[in-house]
C-alpha cells in the first residue's frame, strides 16, 4: 500500500476555541462535525491543470470537492512535525475535522507495492513522537498504520510482538497528545472477527478508541458494518469494551471482486465522508484512500490517475451497494439438558439477492453440531452459515430458513446477515 493504497487513516479531529471541538485528549464517543477538505491534493491539482478535459467536471464535483485523508507516508524526521502542525492548524482554522493516515511502520505492506517506512522501530517511535508534538494537544482522530495488524505474514513471532509493542506505544503517545486512535482491523473478507480481535488485543486496542476497516478496499458498507459488529462482540467477550468502528467508503459504491484490479470499470465511489452514520457502533465513514490514486497494480502506488478517478466518479454501478440487503432473525425451537435446537430466518430486503451469509457469536461454551439448510464454518467463537445452492437466491421480501443443533446453554444470539 502507499499513501493511497488499501491502508488506513489518521483521522484528525481538530479543535479550535469557539469551534466544533475542544483541545486536549479526545474522549471516547461518536464523532461530530464535518471533515476537512484539503485544497492542494493530487486530484485538485489535476483539475486545475486540465480545465478543458472532458473528465474534469466529474472528477472535480464528485472527488476533488470531497474531503479525503492526508497521508503521512514519507519518513522524514526533519519535516514531519511542521507538516502535521500546518495541516492540523488549517483544519482548526476552518473548524473542520482533518483526516490523517500514519503509514510509516517498518516493513509496511510486507515489502509489497507500498513498501517503505521507518528503518527500524526506534526511528519509528521518534517519528511518532514528532507527530504528537505537531498535534500539540489538539483533538485528533488517528487511524493508525493500515495493514499493520491484519497483514503479518512476513513477520516472525518475535517481530510481531515487537510491532504490537510499537503500535501500543504509538497509540498511547498519540492519545496523550490529543489523539482519538483507531487500529487496523483489515476488512470483512480477510481475517475472521475472532482472529482479528485477538490481534487487536495484542496490539493494545484496550488503550485505543476503536478500529477501522476496508481501507483502500471495495467491500460494501453493509458487509463492513456486520464485520464490525462481530468484531465489537468478540472484543467485548475478551473484556475490551467501548470500541467503535470507522469504515473507508472511498471506493465501495460498486463492484468488489479482485482487489488488484485498477481497470475495473464497475467500481464506484461510496458513501460521502460523514460522521452522521446513524449507527452507534460506527463513528464515521471516511475517504481514507483518495479516489483516483492507484494501488500499485497497473499504475505506480499512490499516483493519481484521471482515468481511474473518472471511472470511480461515474454513476453507481448496477446493482448499487445499498440494494440486495438482508436481515436475519433467530428463535430457539427446542431445548434439553445440555443442548438446544435453533432456527434462523433470512429475509431479503427491497431488492433481490443472489445469496446470503449469517454470522453470530457463541457464548458460554456453546458448540455447533449438525446444520441443515446452510453450510456452517466456525472460527473461534464466531459461526458463519452460508446459503445452500438451492436457497440463496431470494426475491425482494422473500425468506429462507436454516436450522442447527448445538450443545451448551440456551441463548438468543444477535445474528447478522449480509448478501453474497
Where in this protein do the model-derived segments appear?
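Secretory targeting and sorting signals
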Residues: 1-28
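N-terminal carbohydrate-binding/catalytic regions of secreted carbohydrate-active enzymes
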Residues: 30-134, 138, 290-305, 309-312, ...
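Low-complexity, acidic Ser/Thr/Pro/Gly-rich terminal tails and inter-domain linkers that flank the onset
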Residues: 322-338, 349
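Active-site cleft segment of glycoside hydrolase catalytic domains centered on the general acid/base Glu
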Residues: 114-138, 146-178, 193-197
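Short, solvent-exposed loop/turn segments enriched in Ser/Thr/Gly
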Residues: 336-343, 400-401
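Terminal connector regions
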Residues: 327, 396, 401-420
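Surface-exposed substrate-engagement region within the catalytic domains
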Residues: 37-64, 173, 188-312
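Short acidic, flexible loop segments centered on an aromatic residue
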Residues: 352-379
Amino acid at each position: 500500500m502507499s499513501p493511497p493504497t488499501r491502508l488506513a487513516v489518521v483521522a484528525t479531529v481538530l479543535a479550535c476555541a469557539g469551534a466544533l471541538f475542544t483541545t486536549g485528549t479526545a474522549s471516547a464517543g461518536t464523532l461530530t462535525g464535518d471533515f476537512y477538505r484539503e485544497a492542494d491534493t493530487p486530484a485538485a491539482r489535476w483539475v486545475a491543470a486540465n480545465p478543458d478535459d472532458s473528465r474534469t467536471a466529474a472528477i472535480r464535483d464528485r472527488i476533488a470537492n470531497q474531503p479525503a485523508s492526508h497521508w503521512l507516508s514519507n519518513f522524514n524526521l526533519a519535516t514531519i512535525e511542521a507538516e502535521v502542525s500546518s495541516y492540523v492548524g488549517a483544519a482548526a482554522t476552518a473548524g473542520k475535522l482533518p483526516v490523517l493516515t500514519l503509514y510509516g511502520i517498518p516493513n509496511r505492506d510486507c515489502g509489497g507495492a507500498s513498501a517503505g517506512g521507518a528503518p527500524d522501530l526506534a526511528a519509528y517511535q521518534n517519528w511518532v513522537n514528532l507527530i504528537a508534538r505537531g498535534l500539540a494537544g489538539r483533538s485528533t482522530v488517528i487511524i493508525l498504520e493500515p495493514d499493520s495488524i491484519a497483514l503479518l505474514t512476513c513477520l516472525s513471532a518475535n517481530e510481531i510482538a515487537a510491532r504490537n509493542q510499537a503500535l501500543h506505544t504509538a497509540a498511547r503517545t498519540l492519545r496523550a497528545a490529543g489523539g482519538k486512535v483507531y487500529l487496523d482491523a483489515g476488512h470483512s473478507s480477510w481475517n475472521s472477527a475472532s482472529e482479528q480481535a485477538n490481534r487487536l488485543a495484542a496490539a493494545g486496542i484496550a488503550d485505543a478508541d476503536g478500529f477501522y476497516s476496508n481501507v483502500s478496499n471495495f467491500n460494501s458498507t453493509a458487509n463492513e458494518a456486520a464485520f464490525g459488529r462481530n468484531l465489537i462482540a468478540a472484543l467485548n467477550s475478551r473484556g475490551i469494551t467501548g470500541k467503535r468502528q470507522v469504515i473507508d467508503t472511498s471506493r465501495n459504491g460498486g463492484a468488489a471482486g479482485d482487489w488488484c484490479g485498477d481497470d475495473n470499470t464497475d467500481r464506484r465511489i461510496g458513501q460521502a465522508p460523514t460522521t452522521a452514520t446513524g449507527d452507534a457502533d460506527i463513528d464515521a465513514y471516511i475517504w481514507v484512500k483518495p479516489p483516483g490514486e492507484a494501488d500499485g497494480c497497473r499504475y505506480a502506488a499512490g499516483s493519481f490517475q484521471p482515468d481511474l478517478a473518472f471511472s470511480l466518479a461515474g454513476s453507481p454501478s448496477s446493482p448499487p451497494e445499498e440494494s440486495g440487503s438482508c436481515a436475519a432473525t433467530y428463535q430457539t425451537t427446542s431445548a434439553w439438558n445440555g443442548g438446544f435446537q435453533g432456527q434462523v430466518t433470512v429475509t431479503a430486503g427491497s431488492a433481490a439477492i443472489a445469496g446470503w451469509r449469517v454470522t453470530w457469536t457463541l457464548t458460554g461454551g456453546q458448540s455447533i453440531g449438525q446444520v441443515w439448510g446452510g453450510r456452517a464454518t466456525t472460527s473461534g467463537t464466531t459461526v458463519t452459515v452460508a446459503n445452500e445452492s438451492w436457497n440463496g437466491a431470494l426475491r425482494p421480501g422473500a425468506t429462507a430458513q436454516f436450522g442447527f443443533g448445538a450443545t451448551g446453554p440456551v441463548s438468543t444470539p444477535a445474528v447478522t446477515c449480509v448478501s453474497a
